[in-house]
Design a protein with these regions (language model features):
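Nucleotide/phosphate-binding catalytic cleft detector across ATP-hydrolyzing
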Residues: 1-174, 192-194, 203
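Glycine-rich phosphate-binding loop of actin/hexokinase-like ATP-binding domains
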Residues: 171-212
Length: 213
C-alpha cells in the first residue's frame, strides 16, 4: 500500500516540463530524503510519472502485404509494432504505443489477429509522443541525484488504470485530469485509448483570474 506522501513547491518545473535541471535535482533529492526519514527506510529505486504540455497522441498505420494466405503469428505482429516505433518524428519521441484494431484483408477488424489467416494486415496504432527533452531532462536529473529509475510511467495511462473501470473503458468515456498548470484529457472507447491531449490550462490560471478581479 501507500506508505507516505510528500510534496514540495517548486518553480523549476512549468506545465510538467523541467526547465532548471539543477533546482529540480535539489528538489528531488529533498523530497526523497524526506520520505526516507518518514518511512525509516532507504529508497534505492523510484518510479517516475511522465506528463506535461508536450504529451499528445498521434495515429499511425503500418500495412503488410503477404504473398499468400498466411496465418498471422505473434512474431509478425511484433515486427509490425517495431516498424511503427521506427517512424521519424521531428524533435519528438514515442513514450508509449496503444495498439488499436488490426484490419485483415479488406474489411475484417479485430484486436486479436494472431491465428487468423489473411493475405494482408493493417496495424493501426495510437502513439503517445512528447518532446525529446521531456524524458531526457528527467533522466538527467535522477542520474544526478544518484537514485535509480525503476520504470518510467506515462502519468495519464497510470491515472486511467487507477480510476476507470473496465466497463467505463468499454462503453466509452473521457477522463479529465485537472491539474495546476495543465489539464489532461484521455478518451476511451471499446476498451482502447482513442485520444490523449494535454491542454495548457489549469487551476493556477483560474486562481490568477480571480485574484485579478
Amino acid at each position: 500500500g501507500l506508505g507516505d506522501v510528500y510534496k514540495r513547491q517548486s518553480d523549476c518545473i512549468k506545465k510538467g516540463a523541467i526547465y532548471n535541471l539543477d533546482k529540480t535535482t535539489q528538489c528531488l533529492s529533498a523530497v526523497i530524503c524526506q520520505l526516507e526519514e518518514t518511512l525509516h527506510a532507504s529508497i534505492k529505486k523510484v518510479y517516475v510519472g511522465i506528463g506535461g504540455q508536450s504529451v499528445r497522441s498521434i495515429r499511425h498505420t503500418e500495412t503488410k502485404q503477404l504473398t499468400e494466405e498466411t496465418k498471422i503469428s505473434q512474431a509478425l505482429i511484433d515486427a509490425i509494432m517495431e516498424s511503427n516505433r521506427e517512424i521519424t518524428l521531428m524533435d519528438q519521441e514515442i513514450l508509449a504505443v496503444e495498439p488499436q484494431e488490426y484490419k485483415l484483408g479488406n474489411n475484417q477488424l479485430t484486436t486479436e489477429p494472431v491465428g487468423i489467416q489473411t493475405d494482408r494486415i493493417e496495424g493501426n496504432f495510437l502513439n503517445i509522443i512528447a518532446r525529446n527533452s521531456l524524458k531526457s531532462n528527467i533522466r538527467q536529473c535522477f542520474r544526478q541525484t544518484g537514485y535509480e529509475v525503476a520504470e518510467y510511467l506515462l502519468s495519464p495511462l497510470a491515472t486511467a488504470n487507477a480510476v476507470l473501470t473496465g466497463s467505463e473503458k468499454r462503453s466509452g468515456c473521457a477522463l479529465v485530469d485537472f491539474g495546476a498548470d495543465t489539464t489532461t484529457v484521455s478518451v476511451y472507447k471499446n476498451n482502447l485509448l482513442r485520444h490523449l491531449a494535454v491542454i495548457p490550462l489549469g487551476s493556477s490560471n483560474i486562481t490568477k483570474d480571480i485574484c485579478s478581479l
